[in-house]
Design a protein with these regions (language model features):
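N-terminal Rossmann-fold cofactor-binding loop
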Residues: 30-35, 50-51
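SDR active-site strand-loop-helix element
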Residues: 6, 30, 70-71, 104-110, ...
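Substrate-positioning beta->alpha
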Residues: 133, 151, 178-188, 199
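Glycine/proline-rich active-site loop of Rossmann-fold NAD(P)-dependent oxidoreductases
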Residues: 160-164, 190-199
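Conserved Rossmann-fold cofactor-binding substructure of NAD(P)-dependent oxidoreductases
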Residues: 45-65
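NAD(P)-cofactor binding segment of oxidoreductase domains
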Residues: 69, 76-104, 132-136
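N-terminal Rossmann NAD(P)H-binding glycine-rich loop of SDR-like oxidoreductase domains
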Residues: 3-23
Length: 205
């Protein structure tokens, strides 16, 4: 497959590249700063671009089988009002429509599930700006006719374990955390297998 990775310099995006290359896929990393990616591989193509730019995305996308988006906002901006993921989701789906690419796997967050309890209420308060941006991005994606999958993982860690559980429209039981690598594995699996089409998926270790 030819996979188009957005957010490729982040923790999850880096793991997506590693897993996809290990499975002999061709990977395009669409990033603002290609020099931040130290990995070199004949199957890896680095493309400099702005994820807000429909024009740049439309130029880079043709010929790919799927878009895997791990875009997110890092602290301290993550704890302030922002719309980055929503804006980039809008430009991405527009460019996909122009380019004839139909498959999208997007990372969101488990905080959007209506879980009960004080801990989840606290997370929803602390992560309210992230949640607002991600929910808006999800709405953008759902409004399209694309074959999308939205992944909602819980707290992410740097563990090397790539195992995960996936549940439609709910957080798996006893979900507390999972690794960036496991989220990346789910994304590549979903792209390869064509699973969870037009579905929201809760993830956990």
């Amino acid at each position: 497959m030819r996979l188009f990775v957005m957010g490729a310099t982040g923790h999850t995006g880096t793991q997506v590249i590693d897993i996809a290359l290990a499975r002999s896929h061709d990977v395009t990393a669409f990033v603002r700063s290609p020099q931040k990616i130290l990995r070199r591989d004949p199957r890896l193509k680095l493309v400099a671009g702005d994820p807000h730019s429909i024009e740049q995305l439309t130029k880079a996308l043709p010929g790919h089988d799927a878009v895997l988006s791990a875009l997110g906002v890092r602290p301290p901006q993550a704890f302030r009002p922002h719309t980055l993921v929503e804006e980039c989701a809008a430009s991405t789906v527009a460019a996909m429509g122009e380019s004839g690419v139909n498959r999208l796997v997007l990372v969101s967050a488990a905080v959007l599930f209506p879980q009960k309890g004080m801990l989840f209420a606290l997370f929803r308060t602390l992560l309210r700006h992230i949640a607002r941006d991600l929910r808006a991005a999800e709405d953008v994606v759902r409004s399209t006719s694309l074959h999308w999958t939205i992944a909602r993982p819980p707290r992410l860690t740097n563990a090397s374990d790539g195992a995960y559980r996936a549940v439609r429209d709910a957080l798996p039981a006893k979900a507390s955390s999972m690794s960036f690598r496991a989220v990346a594995a789910f994304m590549v699996d979903a792209a390869e297998q064509g699973t969870f089409i037009r579905e929201t998926v809760g993830l956990a270790r």
